[in-house]
């Protein structure tokens, strides 16, 4: 299984990122500015998570090549590529012409469901195969990969999927019509911050309720190498 992850991490950004870009470009009226926003804001957000999680809090580590202090240089593109394809398929159920609040809520629900499940599956087998090492309270207590990942993945990735789905639909609704630069950058900044703050806040809150601690404590020092 680890071989799959080692290959997929290169195939995803090299092969599927251009495909995802083209699909979104077609949906978004062949507008490169809106397509670039939908594709690259998540890339930046996902880089933020891995840099802070690995370097600052030492919550996990990538056991692959190439890495820089446990971080894949291409990590943001790996995750954002899968996300872009998932959300493109999800939003096939929400036509471009639907621009009301219900369209955004539907995109958020679909994103939470799909992204939450598939990232739980991906992360579980990445941990089981040794591709990723996580240093959370559950894994330090001897929990299995399934138990440890299930402790955080549904909330973290589910809320991330909801934010991502809502972000791309808001961008579509507001930016496909004529718009100014101010609105464009407002959507970009708002989407990026939401993708970072909401999943982080949801994870910290649920972890505090379940375990009585913030969820930012690394157990790498008490675990066997």
List each model region and its residues.
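Aromatic-rich, lipid-facing transmembrane alpha helices and their immediate juxtamembrane interface loops
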Residues: 1-225
């Amino acid at each position: 299984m680890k071989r799959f992850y080692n290959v997929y991490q290169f195939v995803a950004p090299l092969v599927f990122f251009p495909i995802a870009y083209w699909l979104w470009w077609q949906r978004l009226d062949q507008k490169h500015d809106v397509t670039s926003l939908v594709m690259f804001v998540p890339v930046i957000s996902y880089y933020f998570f891995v840099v802070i999680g690995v370097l600052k809090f030492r919550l996990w580590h990538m056991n692959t090549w190439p890495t820089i202090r446990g971080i894949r240089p291409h990590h943001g593109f790996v995750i954002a590529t899968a996300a872009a394809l998932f959300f493109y398929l999800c939003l096939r159920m929400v036509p471009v012409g639907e621009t009301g609040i219900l369209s955004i809520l539907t995109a958020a629900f679909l994103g939470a469901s799909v992204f939450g499940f598939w990232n739980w599956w991906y992360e579980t087998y990445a941990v089981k195969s040794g591709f990723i090492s996580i240093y959370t309270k559950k894994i330090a207590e001897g929990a299995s990969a399934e138990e440890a990942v299930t402790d955080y993945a549904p909330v973290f990735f589910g809320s991330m999927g909801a934010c991502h789905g809502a972000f791309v639909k808001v961008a579509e609704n507001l930016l496909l019509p004529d718009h100014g630069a101010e609105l464009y950058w407002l959507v970009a900044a708002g989407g990026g911050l939401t993708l970072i703050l909401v999943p982080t806040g949801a994870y910290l809150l649920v972890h505090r309720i379940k375990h009585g601690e913030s969820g930012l404590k690394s157990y790498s020092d008490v675990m066997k190498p």
